[in-house]
Every structure is written in structure tokens, then in C-alpha cells.
A protein has these predicted regions:
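The feature captures the beta-strand-to-loop junction immediately N-terminal to the Walker
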Residues: 34-36
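Hydrophobic anchor residue at the start of the ABC signature
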Residues: 152, 180
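Conserved ABC ATPase signature
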Residues: 114, 138-142, 146
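Conserved structural motif at the start of ABC-family nucleotide-binding domains
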Residues: 3, 18-20
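Conserved ABC ATPase "signature" region
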Residues: 116-134, 159
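Catalytic Walker B motif of ABC-type/P-loop ATPase nucleotide-binding domains
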Residues: 163-167
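Helix-to-loop junction immediately C-terminal to a conserved catalytic motif
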Residues: 49
């Protein structure tokens, strides 16, 4: 299992956002979390990404990639996430090409000294996702759907072990929804 939670409770701003979570996710599984607003789906993503930490009690356990404590850099290399938190961290003056390139380096800003190999990877994924026409557009000028598909390309470029998408097809046109699914 790459993710194991036993009796996990999490609090955010003084409110319990996850109560007694018990969940195991195998490497080979595709998981879809469905639930009403406020049920803890996005909070679980924050736990996985180590943006919020659970309250560990006697019977509680949390392991990610088989480790109770994991180096954040290792985590960032192995997991790619697309959610509103990521969208809000992106420099709005970044062009889409540079946005996708930043995914290779785990950054949210312009990357200097990019290699030809890395540029080729960006061009390849943009072509595959049919967004080459967005290459020189600034992130702030994109539609919500264009932002989403560009962020998915950014997440995929480093070929992560785990891809986490929060509301992955929201704001996407039919063709893009089909590609993501």
C-alpha cells in the first residue's frame, strides 16, 4: 500500500475535518472519492501532501509509501497533485510553457537554465494534451478549463508514482474531459 491510515483525525482552524479515517490504497488502485461538500475529500489530499497533519492517538497510524515519517522532497517527487491550492500558488505572469516546465523542478515560478531535453519534454506533453497553442499564453489570461488542463500537464510531466486530481474535470470542455478520464 502506498497510503495507510488507521483511526486518523485531523483538525483545521479548530474544526475536525477528518474523523476516524481508516483507508488503505494499493499502488495498483484507481480511487475516486465521492461525497458532499465539506466531507473531507480535499482535506485528505492535504494530509497526503503533508499540508495538514493528523492528530496521532494510541491506536492511530499514518503511512505514506510505507513510512510514518517521509521527507517532503521525496513526497513531492513521487506525488503530483492538481487542486485549487496549486492553482493559487502559480505565478499569474508565468507562460504555460514555463508553468509546465516548473513541474519538473517542483516549483511554482519561472525556471532559469532549462535544458533542451526538458524543453522537449514540455513540447511533447503539450502536443499530447493538445495545448501547444497555449505555450506563450500567460496563466492569468487562461480560461478556467485551460488552467486546469495546463496544471494537469504540469503534474504529468514528471511521471509521478501517484497522481491526485481534485475535481479533475470541472471547467473542462468535452474533449479535455475525455482525455483526462
Amino acid at each position: 500500500f502506498w497510503f495507510e491510515a488507521k483511526n486518523i483525525n485531523c483538525f483545521k482552524n479548530g474544526f475536525r475535518v477528518i474523523k476516524d479515517l481508516n483507508l488503505k490504497i494499493a499502488y495498483s488502485e484507481n480511487v475516486i472519492l465521492i461525497g458532499p461538500n465539506g466531507s473531507g475529500k480535499s482535506s485528505l489530499i492535504e494530509v497526503i501532501n503533508r499540508n495538514i497533519y493528523p492528530v496521532i492517538a494510541n491506536e492511530s497510524k499514518l503511512k505514506i509509501f510505507g513510512k510514518e515519517l517521509i521527507n517532503l522532497w521525496e513526497l513531492r517527487k513521487r506525488i503530483s497533485t492538481v487542486n485549487n491550492d496549486i492553482k493559487n500558488r502559480i505565478n499569474p505572469n508565468l507562460q504555460v510553457f514555463d508553468l509546465i516546465l516548473s513541474g519538473l523542478y517542483g516549483r511554482y515560478c519561472y525556471v532559469q537554465n532549462k535544458s533542451e531535453r526538458d524543453s522537449y519534454k514540455v513540447e511533447k506533453i503539450m502536443k499530447k494534451m493538445n495545448i501547444s497553442n497555449l505555450s506563450k499564453k500567460y496563466f492569468s489570461y487562461l480560461s478556467d478549463g485551460e488552467k486546469k488542463i495546463s496544471l494537469i500537464a504540469r503534474a504529468l510531466i514528471k511521471k509521478p508514482d501517484i497522481l491526485i486530481l481534485d475535481e479533475p474535470i470541472a471547467n473542462l470542455d468535452y474533449k479535455s474531459k475525455f482525455f483526462v478520464v
